[in-house]
């Protein structure tokens, strides 16, 4: 049996990533991907949009959306949700997603004039943001948990395009696993993960970002409410223990 598990949005090229070399392009050739989708006995996708696309290609119409998952035994909250120290707003990502963070530069500079906070950027690149208390941390697997546990508010800015429409929303799930109140752009798969003002905060405009971050910085009780609910949703829906059962159902069906 051939089971094809697709994590990335293979429908579209990421317009924000740097160019790759010819070998990588060959290995990722769209023709090979389409062939595998078509021939697979079952296709597993990481977003509803991606799943709908694969159904039109797979000859057996045997496709299912299974969300990205996190290790909730390792991704453990450590936040006490108080303001006894400067609140840390955190973002994590790679250089290819840096543009999304860049879109918040003006918001963060303006926010710093009315709120006392630190911005923690965890990634694989250097970053500068004059006018903001900034901490840049190089991402490592060994320190990932510790670095994310040091955040009070997770931010997940995106833009509305075809690439984002097929993304899984894993970054939001990661923040939520740590019990972090997460502010995210209301596009793509994010609204199916974050329920506005129940376990996170969905925004559209720069004004929305300003208001949400200002409220969360100044209201520890709201951070706690959203953060605890976020952790609960991840445990019930996105934990590796929950997701592995969905994979087992598919494997057993193919026997």
Predicted regions and their residues:
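Membrane-proximal helix-turn-helix segments that form the acceptor-binding/catalytic region
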Residues: 10, 23-43
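Donor nucleotide-sugar binding/catalytic pocket of nucleotide-sugar-dependent glycosyltransferases
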Residues: 38-77
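Short, polar loop motifs at secondary-structure junctions
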Residues: 48-51, 121-128, 186-189
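Conserved catalytic-core segment of nucleotide-activated headgroup transferases in glycan assembly
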Residues: 69-77, 82-150
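Nucleotide-sugar-dependent
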Residues: 99, 142-177, 184-192
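Conserved acidic donor-binding segment of nucleotide-sugar-dependent glycosyltransferases
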Residues: 196-207, 215-221
């Amino acid at each position: 049996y051939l089971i094809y598990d697709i994590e990335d949005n293979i429908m579209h090229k990421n317009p924000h990533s740097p160019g790759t070399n010819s070998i990588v392009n060959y290995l990722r050739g769209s023709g090979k991907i389409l062939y595998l989708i078509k021939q697979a006995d079952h296709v597993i996708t990481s977003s509803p949009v991606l799943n709908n696309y694969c159904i039109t290609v797979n000859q057996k119409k045997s496709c299912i959306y299974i969300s990205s998952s996190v290790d909730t035994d390792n991704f453990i909250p450590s936040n006490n949700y108080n303001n006894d120290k400067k609140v840390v707003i955190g973002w994590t990502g790679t250089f290819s997603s840096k543009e999304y963070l860049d879109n918040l530069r003006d918001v963060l500079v303006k926010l710093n004039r009315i709120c006392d906070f630190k911005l923690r950027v965890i990634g694989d690149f250097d970053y500068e943001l004059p006018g903001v208390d900034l901490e840049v941390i190089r991402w490592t697997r060994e320190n990932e948990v510790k670095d994310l546990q040091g955040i009070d508010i997770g931010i997940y800015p995106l833009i509305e395009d075809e690439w984002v429409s097929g993304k899984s929303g894993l970054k939001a799930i990661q923040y939520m696993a740590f019990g972090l109140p997460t502010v995210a752009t209301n596009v793509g798969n994010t609204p199916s993960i974050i329920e506005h003002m129940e376990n996170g905060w969905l925004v559209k405009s720069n004004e929305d970002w300003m208001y949400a971050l200002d409220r969360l910085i100044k209201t520890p009780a709201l951070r706690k409410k959203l953060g605890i609910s976020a952790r609960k949703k991840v445990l019930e829906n996105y934990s590796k223990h929950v997701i592995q059962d969905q994979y087992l159902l598919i494997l057993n069906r193919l026997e």
